[in-house]
């Protein structure tokens, strides 16, 4: 009996030692922590070599919307514009930029055996067909404007806009600098030359002194198509035909 008790006590003692050794070798379980995914870095653009379309040259076809049937035009009416602009890329998205500048815009409309009395002492502008009497072989109306264009631009590759598609919408506000008619080569009703000379008459009396023109450009690199439509009338209300000039053409940009 004593032997049984001694054997049992020995077994319990050994088990106790083994349990203590096992507990001391166990490592605490650390709670798993899921690391947050790193935030995607915003792409940085290098604009140090970016051309900003500071200088714009435009040539285009000019016309009059709402032109009366009694006004006969001919030839290739045209516009010439030149602007210097400052370009400011958006820090939040360099694809976009805003541009503002100044320049000069000119329109030249050619007429077929017509007379515009812009200098006549009349209450309204005289516009008449002179094909059945003496007239000028070549006759045109030219206007020149000092303008301030503003554009919102988008470039598909802001680091290399000279090799990228681009879009621009904007508006330009202009003040009239000069308006004149120019006639060349005086003829009779049979279109026979009577005398070769040039007559130029200048007056701004019948013209609106301010014009507002929404604009649009789209193209690639340094060449873009442009369109412009004057929402203000060319002549003062009630003093001349209710025409609104428009232009479609090409823009060459640089710097």
Language-model segments: which ranges?
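Extracellular/periplasm-exposed beta-strand and loop segments of Gram-negative cell-envelope proteins
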Residues: 68-75, 110-120, 125-143, 176-188, ...
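Surface-exposed strand-loop-strand hairpins of Gram-negative outer-membrane beta-barrel proteins
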Residues: 62-83, 202, 235
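Sec-dependent signal peptide cleavage junction
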Residues: 17-54
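Short loop/turn motifs that connect adjacent beta-strands in outer-membrane beta-barrel proteins
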Residues: 40-53, 89-96, 157-165, 180
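Residues that define the transmembrane beta-barrel architecture of outer-membrane proteins
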Residues: 51-53, 74-80, 142-148, 208-212, ...
């Amino acid at each position: 009996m004593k032997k049984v008790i001694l054997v049992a006590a020995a077994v319990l003692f050994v088990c106790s030692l083994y349990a203590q050794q096992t507990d001391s070798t166990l490592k605490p379980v650390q709670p798993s922590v899921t690391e947050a995914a790193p935030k995607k870095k915003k792409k940085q653009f290098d604009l140090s070599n970016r051309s900003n379309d500071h200088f714009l040259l435009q040539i285009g076809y000019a016309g009059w919307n709402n032109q009366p049937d009694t006004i006969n035009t001919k030839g290739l009416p045209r516009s010439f514009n030149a602007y210097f602009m400052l370009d400011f890329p958006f820090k939040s998205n360099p694809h976009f930029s805003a541009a503002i500048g100044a320049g000069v815009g000119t329109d030249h409309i050619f007429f077929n055996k017509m007379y515009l009395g812009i200098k006549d002492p009349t209450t309204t502008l005289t516009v008449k067909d002179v094909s059945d009497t003496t007239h000028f072989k070549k006759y045109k109306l030219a206007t020149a404007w000092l303008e301030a264009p503003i554009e919102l631009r988008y470039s598909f590759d802001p680091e290399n806009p000279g090799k990228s598609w681009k879009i621009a919408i904007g508006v330009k506000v202009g003040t009239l600098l000069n308006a004149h008619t120019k006639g060349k080569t005086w003829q009779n009703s049979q279109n026979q030359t009577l005398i070769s000379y040039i007559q130029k008459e200048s007056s701004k009396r019948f013209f609106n002194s301010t014009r507002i023109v929404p604009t649009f450009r789209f193209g690639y690199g340094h060449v873009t198509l442009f369109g412009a439509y004057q929402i203000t009338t060319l002549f003062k209300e009630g003093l001349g035909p209710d025409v609104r000039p428009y232009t479609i053409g090409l823009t060459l940009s640089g710097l």
